[in-house]
């Protein structure tokens, strides 16, 4: 018997919608990253992008444990001397809640061209409305 190696024609991608309300950030991000990579499928191959599309709604209602709202910091640099900016999780959740989940999942994906392609299959929205109704995403109840 030969080992099955998937080809781009064999990849079957599905659309799922996840409600992030009252879910813990890290636990939700790990399961999303797992599905984006396609590791839940028997035909997983580490050199191919065979994961599913994930639509996350209610990202502004995500929870964190402990004192992370005050203590967790996000850094970005402008490229100029002294241009390091620091933002707390609390401020980022208030202004751009989509970025919080995107940054958490990005850190769990491969740091190469394949990881960037996987991240494009993640769609994060505030509220319950999303523009992907035509794809008929099935609700996905993630368990921890």
Swiss-Prot record:
Q: Identify the keywords attached in UniProt to this record, alphabetized.
A: Ribonucleoprotein, Ribosomal protein
| Recorded GO MF terms | mRNA binding; structural constituent of ribosome
Instruction: State the Pfam families in the record.
Output: Ribosomal_L13 (PF00572)
Ribosomal protein keyword on record = yes
Gene3D superfamilies assigned to the protein according to its UniProt record, in alphabetical order: Ribosomal protein L13
Task: Supply the CDD domains for this chain.
Answer: Ribosomal_L13
Q: Which GO terms describe its biological process?
A: negative regulation of translation; translation
Task: Kindly give the PROSITE patterns that the UniProt entry links to this protein.
Answer: RIBOSOMAL_L13 (PS00783)
Gene Ontology CC terms, in alphabetical order: cytosolic large ribosomal subunit
Q: Write down the InterPro entries for this protein, in alphabetical order.
A: Ribosomal_uL13, Ribosomal_uL13_bac-type, Ribosomal_uL13_CS, Ribosomal_uL13_sf
Q: Does the keyword Repeat apply?
A: no
Known role: This protein is one of the early assembly proteins of the 50S ribosomal subunit, although it is not seen to bind rRNA by itself. It is important during the early stages of 50S assembly.
Family stated for the protein in its record: Belongs to the universal ribosomal protein uL13 family.
UniProt subunit comment = Part of the 50S ribosomal subunit.
- For this entry, the protein name equals Large ribosomal subunit protein uL13
Q: Which organism is it from?
A: Nitratidesulfovibrio vulgaris (strain ATCC 29579 / DSM 644 / CCUG 34227 / NCIMB 8303 / VKM B-1760 / Hildenborough) (Desulfovibrio vulgaris)
Q: What is the lineage of its organism?
A: Bacteria, Pseudomonadati, Thermodesulfobacteriota, Desulfovibrionia, Desulfovibrionales
